Amino acid sequence: MERNVLITADSTCDLPAELKKKYNISTYPLHIILGRTSYDDGVNITPDEIYKHFKASGTLPKTSAVNVQEYIDGFLPLVEQGYEIVHINLGSALSASYKNCCIAAEQLGNVYPVDSCNLSSASGLLALEAAEMAEKGMSGKEIAENIRALTSKTYGSFVVDRLDYLRAGGRCSTIAMLGANLLSLKPSIIVNNKDGSMT
């Protein structure tokens, strides 16, 4: 039986709604914890609300991965309808989401998790490429293999405008933050596309 392929991704791929709709990519939200309340990324909280929380409280949000049952609950109806699923995960060095997705995939079959070794737009680009492969009629297994090969060619980097977030998260000292601000330095964070760690 020939199976149609759907592309899904973790919410951290940061694809705009128009692209998700155009390529029929659904996302699975990671959890953002502010104080004692847990929110679903991109569902019931926006980046602006997270920034407002930080400004008001001075504390960074915590995050948690999509859990195994959430993946199963999302994938099972699709697998039962005859779809293969290629899921683009947030880099495994950054989150347990990939590990959890692999456990769900083992239980369900016809689900192909891909460790993007990246985040944000870099993993979003992989999801878009996977969607184009699906449109060409490639199988889920073929798409997953091709996307895994592309992870080493996909680079993510970010220029940090404000160091107060890095200081609050323990990534730089107060002195380093003040010195960078005084000299108007804007550090760049580069994602290692071999394991998803950041430097």
Where in the sequence are the language-model features?
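Mixed-charge interfacial surface used for oligomerization/domain docking
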Residues: 3-6, 12-20, 26, 31, ...
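N-terminal glycine-rich anion-binding loop in soluble enzyme alpha/beta folds
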Residues: 6-67
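Glycine-rich phosphate- or other oxyanion-binding loops that anchor nucleotides, phosphorylated ligands
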Residues: 57-59, 65-91, 100, 144, ...
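Glycine/charged-rich beta-loop-alpha catalytic/anionic-binding loops adjacent to active sites
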Residues: 53-56, 82-87, 105-116
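Residue-level preference for short coil/turn positions at secondary-structure junctions
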Residues: 1-3, 81
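Catalytic cores of large soluble enzymes that bind and process phosphate-bearing ligands
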Residues: 42, 63-67, 89, 139, ...
